[in-house]
């Protein structure tokens, strides 16, 4: 990339970008400041209002170009049929070779988002990365992404990496919205990037892996608005999943404890969210309880798909315990035996699980099932998992179906940090609207997944062994065929004798 531009050439470049932007067809995005170089930002502190409808304007999803079939993996691992496909709810699992790392995943997804939206690179004023895939204890992924901004001369970009297991992406999204609704905002867009490679040692946990990245453009007048004041958060100190060994990319996991922590955090966050929305309603003259009926769609962080179905059932159980009216008819019919139970006593209660999984099945099919498409066929993407579910939901519904709805979201990161929050979808689903364009941008998700290469369990295992062999090595060029990557993918070209990483991009 060209490193420097003379002042004259910088001015010419800015003018050219502005002229080209004015000639584009109907813009994908509402206008913030198209170029900070020529349009002075007005500090928010000098205004009397918040920027309107801050949220997600555009999204881009990246996943690896190869996968292993979970049915074949069951046979290869000599486990009973259905352990992965039924027990976990997983059909396929995407994975990365040594050619890809978290930096390359994030480079790819950011470049693809910027190219598709045709935004000037200097229209971004904040970029934050959520990841738990740490390949350097000091140097952030965000600093590598700055390579993409060099030709524009834009180095005035706030934000850095945020890490806590699978929660970093959500923290980054909240930070972007907070920045935009503060006196620090300079009028430009924010980019939120979530990327991870989920890998486990050979054994029971390996089929719950995956890999991918999601980039989100955040700004005002968004089609997916973060509902202000409606975040229920729970945090505590627990060792359910953690990575203390810096010489390995594998975590230490207490699977049973982690599931209990996930469900306990869900209970806590849902209760806090419910309290806040009911308080808002009372201030508006509405005095009634909040339930899942007030959420048209519900997405979850997805370590594996079966846990998500159990989680929606758990939310229904929460509503049931608080229901003050008749619970002997309607959706709660046949559940009265569970009336006297306490949430904290039921995390391992199989009777509760079975009963509410059955009772909530129609609700699951309507509100959540479509959001699991990417997780089913690509696996766990850690920080980007929840937002892959959001993209899947958009890909399976029309703008007209989504318009005006509320999308509930539960984010969880082991250790632990969790939040329940919501998006309000724009009412405008007309052709060319920001919502219609956002939904249309996800329409190729199924086609892209179908275009991947299926790899045998034997080859998959060999590639996992290669990842172990090259992890934290220096002075090497990764093995593999660059042509096996999707066009436009960034990849690791070389690690030199000082551990410095060099990347290249496969031509589009």
UniProtKB/Swiss-Prot annotation:
<keyword id="KW-0753">Steroid metabolism</keyword>
<dbReference type="Pfam" id="PF01154">
    <property type="entry name" value="HMG_CoA_synt_N"/>
</dbReference>
<feature type="modified residue" description="N6-succinyllysine; alternate">
    <location>
        <position position="447"/>
    </location>
</feature>
<dbReference type="GO" id="GO:0006695">
    <property type="term" value="P:cholesterol biosynthetic process"/>
</dbReference>
<feature type="modified residue" description="N6-acetyllysine; alternate">
    <location>
        <position position="473"/>
    </location>
</feature>
<feature type="modified residue" description="Phosphoserine">
    <location>
        <position position="477"/>
    </location>
</feature>
<keyword id="KW-0444">Lipid biosynthesis</keyword>
<keyword id="KW-0153">Cholesterol metabolism</keyword>
<feature type="binding site">
    <location>
        <position position="301"/>
    </location>
    <ligand>
        <name>(3S)-3-hydroxy-3-methylglutaryl-CoA</name>
    </ligand>
</feature>
<feature type="modified residue" description="Phosphoserine">
    <location>
        <position position="440"/>
    </location>
</feature>
<keyword id="KW-0443">Lipid metabolism</keyword>
<feature type="modified residue" description="N6-acetyllysine; alternate">
    <location>
        <position position="310"/>
    </location>
</feature>
<keyword id="KW-0496">Mitochondrion</keyword>
<feature type="modified residue" description="N6-succinyllysine; alternate">
    <location>
        <position position="358"/>
    </location>
</feature>
<dbReference type="GO" id="GO:0005739">
    <property type="term" value="C:mitochondrion"/>
</dbReference>
<feature type="active site" description="Proton donor/acceptor">
    <location>
        <position position="132"/>
    </location>
</feature>
<feature type="active site" description="Proton donor/acceptor">
    <location>
        <position position="301"/>
    </location>
</feature>
<keyword id="KW-0597">Phosphoprotein</keyword>
<feature type="modified residue" description="N6-succinyllysine; alternate">
    <location>
        <position position="256"/>
    </location>
</feature>
<feature type="binding site">
    <location>
        <position position="208"/>
    </location>
    <ligand>
        <name>(3S)-3-hydroxy-3-methylglutaryl-CoA</name>
    </ligand>
</feature>
<feature type="binding site">
    <location>
        <position position="204"/>
    </location>
    <ligand>
        <name>(3S)-3-hydroxy-3-methylglutaryl-CoA</name>
    </ligand>
</feature>
<feature type="binding site">
    <location>
        <position position="80"/>
    </location>
    <ligand>
        <name>(3S)-3-hydroxy-3-methylglutaryl-CoA</name>
    </ligand>
</feature>
<keyword id="KW-0809">Transit peptide</keyword>
<feature type="binding site">
    <location>
        <position position="258"/>
    </location>
    <ligand>
        <name>(3S)-3-hydroxy-3-methylglutaryl-CoA</name>
    </ligand>
</feature>
<protein>
    <recommendedName>
        <fullName>Hydroxymethylglutaryl-CoA synthase, mitochondrial</fullName>
        <ecNumber>2.3.3.10</ecNumber>
    </recommendedName>
</protein>
<feature type="modified residue" description="N6-succinyllysine">
    <location>
        <position position="333"/>
    </location>
</feature>
<feature type="modified residue" description="N6-acetyllysine; alternate">
    <location>
        <position position="354"/>
    </location>
</feature>
<feature type="transit peptide" description="Mitochondrion">
    <location>
        <begin position="1"/>
        <end position="37"/>
    </location>
</feature>
<dbReference type="GO" id="GO:0010142">
    <property type="term" value="P:farnesyl diphosphate biosynthetic process, mevalonate pathway"/>
</dbReference>
<comment type="subunit">
    <text>Homodimer.</text>
</comment>
<dbReference type="GO" id="GO:0042802">
    <property type="term" value="F:identical protein binding"/>
</dbReference>
<feature type="modified residue" description="N6-acetyllysine; alternate">
    <location>
        <position position="350"/>
    </location>
</feature>
<keyword id="KW-1207">Sterol metabolism</keyword>
<feature type="modified residue" description="N6-acetyllysine; alternate">
    <location>
        <position position="358"/>
    </location>
</feature>
<dbReference type="GO" id="GO:0046951">
    <property type="term" value="P:ketone body biosynthetic process"/>
</dbReference>
<feature type="modified residue" description="N6-succinyllysine; alternate">
    <location>
        <position position="350"/>
    </location>
</feature>
<dbReference type="InterPro" id="IPR000590">
    <property type="entry name" value="HMG_CoA_synt_AS"/>
</dbReference>
<dbReference type="InterPro" id="IPR010122">
    <property type="entry name" value="HMG_CoA_synthase_euk"/>
</dbReference>
<feature type="binding site">
    <location>
        <position position="380"/>
    </location>
    <ligand>
        <name>(3S)-3-hydroxy-3-methylglutaryl-CoA</name>
    </ligand>
</feature>
<feature type="binding site">
    <location>
        <position position="310"/>
    </location>
    <ligand>
        <name>(3S)-3-hydroxy-3-methylglutaryl-CoA</name>
    </ligand>
</feature>
<dbReference type="GO" id="GO:0006084">
    <property type="term" value="P:acetyl-CoA metabolic process"/>
</dbReference>
<feature type="modified residue" description="N6-acetyllysine; alternate">
    <location>
        <position position="342"/>
    </location>
</feature>
């Amino acid at each position: 990339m060209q490193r420097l531009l003379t002042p004259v050439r910088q001015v010419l470049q800015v003018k050219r970008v502005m002229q080209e932007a004015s000639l584009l067809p109907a813009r994908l995005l509402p206008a913030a400041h198209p170029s900070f170089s020529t349009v002075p930002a007005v500090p928010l502190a000098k205004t009397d209002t918040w920027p309107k409808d801050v949220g997600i304007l555009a999204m881009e999803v990246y996943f690896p170009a190869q996968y292993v079939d979970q049915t074949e993996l069951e046979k290869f691992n000599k486990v009973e049929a259905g352990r992965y496909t039924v027990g976990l709810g997983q059909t396929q699992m995407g994975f990365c070779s040594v050619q890809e790392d978290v930096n390359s995943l994030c480079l790819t997804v950011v470049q693809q988002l910027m190219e598709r939206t045709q935004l000037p690179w200097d229209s971004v004023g904040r970029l934050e990365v959520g990841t738990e895939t740490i390949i350097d204890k000091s140097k952030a992924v965000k600093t590598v992404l700055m390579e993409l901004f060099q030709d524009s001369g834009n180095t005035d970009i706030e934000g850095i990496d945020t890490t806590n297991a699978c929660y970093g992406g959500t923290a980054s999204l909240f930070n972007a919205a907070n920045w935009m609704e503060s006196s620090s905002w300079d009028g430009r867009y924010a980019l939120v990037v979530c990327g991870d490679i989920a890998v486990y040692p050979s054994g029971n946990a390996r089929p719950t892996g995956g890999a991918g990245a999601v980039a989100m453009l955040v700004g005002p007048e968004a089609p997916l608005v973060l509902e202000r004041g409606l975040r229920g958060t729970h945090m505590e100190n627990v060792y359910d999943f953690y990575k203390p060994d810096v010489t390995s990319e594998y975590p230490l996991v207490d699977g049973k404890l982690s599931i209990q922590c996930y469900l306990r955090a869900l209970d806590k966050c849902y209760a806090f969210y419910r309290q806040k929305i009911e308080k808002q309603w009372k201030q508006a003259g509405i005095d009634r309880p909040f339930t899942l009926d007030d959420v048209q769609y519900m997405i979850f962080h997805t370590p594996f798909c079966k846990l998500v179905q159990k989680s929606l059932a758990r939310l229904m159980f929460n509503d049931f315990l608080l229901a003050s009216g008749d619970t002997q008819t309607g959706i709660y019919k046949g559940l009265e035996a569970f009336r006297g139970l306490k949430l904290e006593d039921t995390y391992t209660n199989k009777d509760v699980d079975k009963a509410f999984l059955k009772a909530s099945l129609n609700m699951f099919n309507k509100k959540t099932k479509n959001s699991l498409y990417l997780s089913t066929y690509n696996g766990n993407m850690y920080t980007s998992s929840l937002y892959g579910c959001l993209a899947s939901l958009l890909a399976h519904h029309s703008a007209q179906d989504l318009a005006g709805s509320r999308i509930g979201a539960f984010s969880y990161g082991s250790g632990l940090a969790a939040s329940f929050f919501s998006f309000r979808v724009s009412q405008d689903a007309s052709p060319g609207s920001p919502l219609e364009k956002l939904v249309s941008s996800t329409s190729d998700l199924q086609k892209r997944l179908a275009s991947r290469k299926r790899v045998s369990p034997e080859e998959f295992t060999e590639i996992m062994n290669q990842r172990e062999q090259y992890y934290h090595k220096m002075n090497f060029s990764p093995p593999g065929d660059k042509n096996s990557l999707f066009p436009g993918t960034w990849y690791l070209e070389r690690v030199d004798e000082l551990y410095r990483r060099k990347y290249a991009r496969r031509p589009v």
